[in-house]
Amino acid sequence: KADLYVLTSARTFSGAEEFSYNLQNLKRATIIGETTGGGAHPTNAMIVQHDFILRVPFARAINPVSKTNWEGTGVTPDIAVPAAEAFEKAYALALEKLAAKASDTRLKAGYDWILTGEKAKKNPLRVDAKTLQTYAGEYGERHVTFENGTLFYQRTGPKYRLVPMTPTIFALDGLDDFRIEFVVKDGK
């Protein structure tokens, strides 16, 4: 049994709403996003005049669990977030659950790695310029520079902006599988 997340918005309508509503009432999915549009009844279009169409419901969708439907109210998400944030929220929840269930420590570490990166993207950390400047320097073949309030990393090839995840751990912008930790001892 796998966890299922259904993403919704105010523009989710009709059949997509029925899918969301039914899975929610059967407790088979977690609905994440915005309340849906509220169109449960199928309609037929009737031409009244050449420039006027009337849509009339001809049936009613009734959920066997709730004994009702979402007409006019929409499907209320289990987790309400703006539609633009629904994927990030579902992704983070999936990673958290996978990490919690993982019995293999390497697999758990992998899920935690991704989750830490996603959280850092969502809530960027600010590290003061004075601290950042202390990290600038030569580390063997690796060069860390401080430019316009930002740290950059370069070995050979392109230069990467360093994105703070913690005050001492940084991700390389554009490289999700590489991070740098500055080990500070005795204030250095």
Spell out what each predicted region is.
Residues K1-A129:
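C-terminal "post-core" interaction segments
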Residues A100-K188:
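Peripheral terminal and inter-domain segments
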